[in-house]
Amino acid sequence: MKYDMKQKLSRYSARKLLRAGWAARTLTATVMLMMAVVAPVNVSRGYAAAASDESLAAVVELADFSDGREAKAAGKRRERREQADVLAAQLLLRAREAEDGITAAMQQLETEGSYLEGLENRFKSADSLSGKILADADANLESLDTAAGAISDVLRYTLVVDEKSYADRVPKALHQLEASGFTVIKFRNAWGGKFYQGINAQLMSPEGVRVELQFHTAQSYAIKQVSHEVYEIRRNPKASEDERAEATRMSVVYNNHVIMPDGADKVTWEGKTGQAA
């Protein structure tokens, strides 16, 4: 029974044929070469047509295979995103359950010359949290569960401290939180580095919820807010090399304007200063 190629091809769009790409072109070229070398010079018109039909059928099969692989990959990406969304929702739910007590403890840190800033943004958004879980899992070659468990800023706070009392106030605030049942699990003093200027502490609340607390001056906080856009470009894997280079340059320019309080770069916690960058 003669192979009806026109009927076969009618079920496939030109788009599928094109997406077969290099493999399809290579296969077609190979078939044509074999015909030129092996077939008689006076090959019949019917035989030549049959060989051409067979090569086109192979192209169609390759197009189907390519579509199947792409659909499978897209399905896996969608499944991972859904898993990350669930983990993000669980982290936020737990944080919201403990938030009242944590916020109350942070508000106790407010004294003359120090105050909480950006309290309305204390929760990380669900989309941002889900994206961070995916990015950290890929970067560290770890499971989504492991990446989610390491996130420390589902709840985050910023204490702005007067420049004159900054070096003394930071350790006092941490001691005050420890007395309230918090544990300091990580301390990073970034004063004197090229980029971010300030002190970050990762805490574990009495309820077992990870919390981030940043210590800033009014000026360092303002510059952090202004430079946030270039910070996002620097860590965006989709940004071009030129875009990241320009964002890095602008970050250095911004942070060179920050005035460091006396003794801020010497502040430690249990003998550790963290690492400036």
For each predicted feature, which ranges?
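Long beta-strand-rich cores associated with HINT superfamily self-processing modules
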Residues: 142-277
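Intrinsically disordered, low-complexity polar/charged tails and linkers
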Residues: 51-140
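Bacterial N-terminal signal peptides
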Residues: 26-38
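N-terminal secretory signal peptides that target proteins for export/translocation
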Residues: 1-20
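Long, polar low-complexity intrinsically disordered regions
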Residues: 2, 13, 25, 42-45, ...
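Signal peptide processing junction and immediate N-terminal pro/mature segment
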Residues: 37-54
